[in-house]
Amino acid sequence: MRLSEESIKYILDLQKNMLPLIYCCANNERLGILEDTIKHYNGIFSYKDSKLSKEEYPINTLLIFLDEMNSESILDIEKALIAMNKRERVLLEANGIDSLINKRNLALSIINRYDINVIKGTKSEIETLIKFQENVEEEKLNESNVNYKYRNFSKKNNTILIIKEDNYYITDGYSEFFIKGNNNYFLNKNELDDIYT
């Protein structure tokens, strides 16, 4: 069977449309690391100063990293979030929100105003988010049912939580599972972390 030139062009255009275009709001060091991982999985990578045309390549995934935010980056995040559709994915990595009040307030503002599909952080960062969003004392929950608060937060915000400690804990509010990432059985820890992002 021979394919016509139009058929081949149609297939290539369809494939280009299905590949994820990921827009990252992060510092330059993080951008370099993520670009390699995203391109390895055939994704297209974009950031504020990239030369990609947003009309030709519509963004379908937004990655937000709160580790080095300034007022200009916050404005870029707001613009990108407003432009996102419901079917597009937004990932928020909650770096440093357990220690800095302005990042905590920014993260809560983003979570409360926009649909965030995935929130990733350490145990203390996620617990800080839960504590300040619910504005309740956490001693009501005993340690034996500690995952209940994660599932409840995930269900309430309609998001997937990825909690990064020795093991990865992932929940969508209804189900939960652990991935042991502390051994180098199949990947090194940095590559595993980038894949979850």
Enumerate the language-model features and the residues they cover:
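N-terminal loops that bind phosphate or other acidic moieties
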Residues: R2-P20, N27-L34, I38-H40, L108-S109, ...
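Conserved N-terminal subdomain of the carbohydrate kinase-like
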Residues: R2-V90
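General beta-strand structural signal in soluble alpha/beta enzymes
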Residues: F45-K48, V90-A94, V118-K123, L161-E165, ...
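Positions that flank functional sites
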Residues: L52-S53, D98-S99, Y169
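Structural alpha-helical scaffold elements that stabilize or flank donor/cofactor-binding regions
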Residues: E55-E56, I110-N112, F153
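Conserved beta-alpha-beta core of the PfkB/ribokinase-like small-molecule kinase fold
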Residues: T61-L63, M69-N145
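Short, small-residue alpha-helix embedded
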Residues: T128, N188-T197
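Conserved phosphate-donor
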Residues: S144-N188
